[in-house]
Amino acid sequence: MDIPDQVLNIARVVRDEGGRALLVGGCVRDELMDKQPKDWDVEVYGIQPPQLREILDQFGSVNVVGEAFTVYKLGAHLDVSLPRRERKAGRGHRAFVIEGDPMMSVADATKRRDFTINAILKDPLTAEIIDPFQGRTDLAAKNLRAVSPETFAEDSLRVLRAAQFAARFEFEIEPLTVELCRPIDLSDLPAERIWGEMEKLLLRAQCPSIGLDWLRKLAVLPQLFPELEALIDVPQEVEWHPEGDVWIHTLLTVDRARESIDDLPYPKQVTVMLAALCHDFGKPATTAFVDGRIRSREHEEGGVRPTIDFLDRLNIYTLDGYDVRAQVIALVRDHLKPGEFYKKRDEVGDGALRRLARKCELDLLYRVAKADSLGRNAEWVPREKWYNAEAQDWFIERARELDVAASAPSPILFGRHLLEMGMQPGPRIGEITKAIYEMQLDGRVTSLDEARAEAKKILSADYADSADGNEIPNARDLSH
């Protein structure tokens, strides 16, 4: 592990002042898992808060966070704190009375941590590992275990953390910890904390399905995600979905989607993963036996309302200026379109793809639809029977040929062009620009000159239909 010089220098000064600075939590865990940490947490023993602040001020700007208990942030990736005592003081995962106590023992300080793998400390100067709860043993066994059965349930967020750690590290949650999690009331958790753990589960895990199925096993779904709970045991036609029910299909789809997003910016990664997770939310309400077969007709449209409810619960709107919410809803509504277009590929005109690009980003739709198509890999079904994305590959190639994979075409004709032609401001300008844009989507207008020519035809028709000619501001309209 490459420990930053800033951390080493702080540890040296703390040592010289009679204290001890120890790395703790995720950075130690990551090193033991052969991962380079991105964030660093340092716990300082034997130094009182005023003296610690004086020490830290030597190493740059210090941002003090917390009222009852102080965390000193030095930049985006280094937190320094004192060991602390916590006492539950009410309902809610943040309802604790917290007191910093630099004289605590390491064993007492680490009792408050969630899992044994996060309760390992390291001296950055001597490389000594301090492991009071056998976290290294659990790391080696790929086991997630609660540090303290007595206090684990005091922080309800730990249930979601258990699922996301299990997904990210592909660990098992040991049985006692499962039993600790299942009865915990999660209604105190705010949306931003729920999403914080779900975001890690969906984006940081290579197989998010592991974490999602742990949410089921830990009894989280009926409390927080009834839309996901509703997918369990919803049947599917074996010919199309040999993998099993809609829940199993959703887990497989999410894993296939996760494989497709590493080249995307963060907001679009979130969009694809949420759309993959929500894409069949309409099936519980639409699935029925029709002519002896299981059908889920119009489940795409039927999934819009539960998707909105799901996004509302997580408070998902825009991320970094990107309208994740609108895109997810559109992707759910249109996730079958690539396959439908492929089936009618000899009839589908360019305008259909251009118009679809106005509703959602076709590159993202391709990824969601492909994940949906490939999310059918039952172990007993030969690969060639399910690994087929011919329709989706055709769809994205055609979208790229039309240059609409990322966005719909920008309009060629704007209102200012009509004003330049002599029209007076008014609602007719919007009507004409819209009509010309529809021609553009159909490929009938490809340049500004052609757009102006078509606009003149519309204006001429307006003039001819007008008894007194007042709809045309002046004759100059037709001469430009």
Question: Language-model features: where?
Answer:
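Catalytic cores of the polymerase beta-like nucleotidyltransferase superfamily
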Residues: 1-463, 468-470, 477-480
